[in-house]
Amino acid sequence: MINKNEQTESTSGAAEQKEDDEEQYVQLSSLGEYKDEVTPLLSPKHVPLVLGKVTKEAAIATHSALHGGMSEEKERQIRDIYDRLDIDNDGTIDIRDLTLALKHETPHIPANLAPVIMSKMSPDDEGRVDFYSFSSYVLENEQKLAEMFADMDRNHDGLVDVVEMKNYCKDIGVPLDDHKAQHIVNKMDQTGSASVDLKEFQEFMMLYPSSDLKDIVDFWRHNLIIDIGEDSQIPEDFSQQEMQEGIWWRHLVAGGAAGAVSRTCTAPFDRIKVYLQVNSSKTNRLGVMSCLKLLHAEGGIKSFWRGNGINVIKIAPESAIKFMCYDQLKRLIQKKKGNEEISTFERLCAGSAAGAISQSTIYPMEVMKTRLALRKTGQLDRGIIHFAHKMYTKEGIRCFYKGYLPNLIGIIPYAGIDLAIYETLKRTYVRYYETNSSEPGVLALLACGTCSSTCGQLSSYPFALVRTRLQALSITRYSPQPDTMFGQFKYILQNEGVTGFYRGITPNFLKVIPAVSISYVVYEKVRTGLGVPVCSRGGLEDIHQFLPCSIHSIIQFFFFPRTFLLTISGRSLRVKPVWRSHFSKFNK
């Protein structure tokens, strides 16, 4: 028999267990509308949760750890974000959910960072993130971001403005000019106050996998070195610290490799362009297809790559000279301005001057490239050096600088118009469609960049055509033509009209899309292999979206200019402008 003491102890134990369960229920009641998902833990020993089965004690301990210092409102905010990231609504976030969410919910954070973010959220490498792990990540990240914000807020007014952003970035070795600092502030600012508070800063950077400000600023600051088959006039900017750490040469190597592969893959377009520039006229009408057949019949498939070797070889010296000159010119301008940052116009001038210097240095290779592209089968049987010696013997040193003047003059309109139209399109987009953001998303930016580059080529193409004709003047088989720039302009205008200045422009445009795409992919691969940190505005997964975007933009620009702005606005391209409020919609 059970004595009274044992019965009393049993009754007392049951009462204590009941009180514990009631206390646990009270703790769980803070979940609000979600308590029904957790309260079944009070009855069975094991219950199904998002990651299988856990014990009641473990679940309650998890809840206590998670909600010990969190308000119900904060919990609701995090739960709302979690539900939005859970694309397939299965109660967990996996790599597919996160990748899709980054693309559609937070385009300012590249989707190629999804694996890094997943590793931060789920350090156990389980491949799935439950609500507790996500909440822990958010709370920890917010704390780190709060400390970072406090460091930036120099006057302790709870706001970070452009001046504070510039000063802090300068202190950590990543100086910003006024334009870039303003861009970063405007990107995070949701109220139009020209400053950022802690809440805006945390919301904007909530999912970014690094809490180090240098990484964050580098992430915004860099632009990809994309080779579109034409020579870029404005080199990339690098901070003093990046120069010391050797990041600059890795970017240049990646850009050079990307350019080499891109130019080799699109060499047939380039040869067709050069051939049409020199040989097409009113009396000798040639189109892309007729030129394609003619070149193939004369030399076969291999003939389409004539001149490509020297076109690739000149990438290295041209890039190196341009970069060194640009860096020295910036230093000279900075020395005269003191502590004031270099403006966009000054960078344009420095870049154009650096481009002119580099072009002057490697211009003989440019002339040889044109001559080699126009040669017939059997005309280069003893190598490039012998070919250059033959040119020198027959025409003298001046032959290596034929067409130099139009080439030099063409640099200014190309670089200036490219930059001006890019900024104009971007501002127009922001003014009409992005009221709370200073810059569109990656697809709209690529569309703007493609079209600004197209306009730059349109403006400078007559100079490029005259340059090519002057370079090939001694080997042309047609009637004698003027051997000066102004004489060529007059000759073309009188004999062929305005359209004569745009011979060969079709293959020039056709090569833009494959050139950009190939260069982008190769650049990303080489940069990653060299250990350069990810700091671009997108990843390889954006390529398949960029292709139709760019093609459509070019077609719209030429044939439907009035509707072009509607295209880049995201209506025709179906670019969802969800980035305008970042994560503010999660708190509605």
Swiss-Prot record:
Segments crossing the lipid bilayer: 252-269, 307-326, 352-365, 403-422, 446-463, 504-523
KW Cell wall biogenesis/degradation (keyword) present: no
The entry's keywords: Calcium, Membrane, Metal-binding, Mitochondrion, Mitochondrion inner membrane, Repeat, Transmembrane, Transmembrane helix, Transport
UniProt-annotated binding residues for Ca(2+) 2: D153, N155, D157, E164
Biased composition (Polar residues): 1-14
Membrane topology: Multi-pass membrane protein
One BP annotation, GO: ATP transport
Source organism superkingdom: Eukaryota
Binding site for Ca(2+) 1: D86, D88, D90, T92, D97
Stretches the record annotates as Disordered: 1-25
PROSITE patterns, per database record: EF_HAND_1, EF_HAND_2, SOLCAR
Stated family: Belongs to the mitochondrial carrier (TC 2.A.29) family.
PANTHER family, per database record: SOLUTE CARRIER FAMILY 25
Identification of the protein by name: Putative calcium-binding mitochondrial carrier F55A11.4
Source organism phylogeny: Eukaryota, Metazoa, Ecdysozoa, Nematoda, Chromadorea
